[in-house]
Amino acid sequence: MKARVTVTLKSGVLDPQGKAIEGALKSLGVSGVGSVRQGKVFDIELSGFDVAKAEAALKDAADKLLANTVIENYRVEVLS
């Protein structure tokens, strides 16, 4: 089973890396760039889980390891 955990900064949290990427895109001539927010994506392969247990295990992993829940949100998706 494949799953994805996407971690993003919460609204209102400053994102200096996103700002740097935004500036770099503009300096490269990419037009129409409004703002950029950076995040992390974890693609994880699991075995021995049904969908509900996989989601629960990944939410637990995100809470404890993958995301800093003070400043980040996360989304868990089971892909297949």
Q: What are the residue ranges of the model-derived segments?
A:
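Long, contiguous binding/interaction regions
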Residues: K2-D43, G48-S80
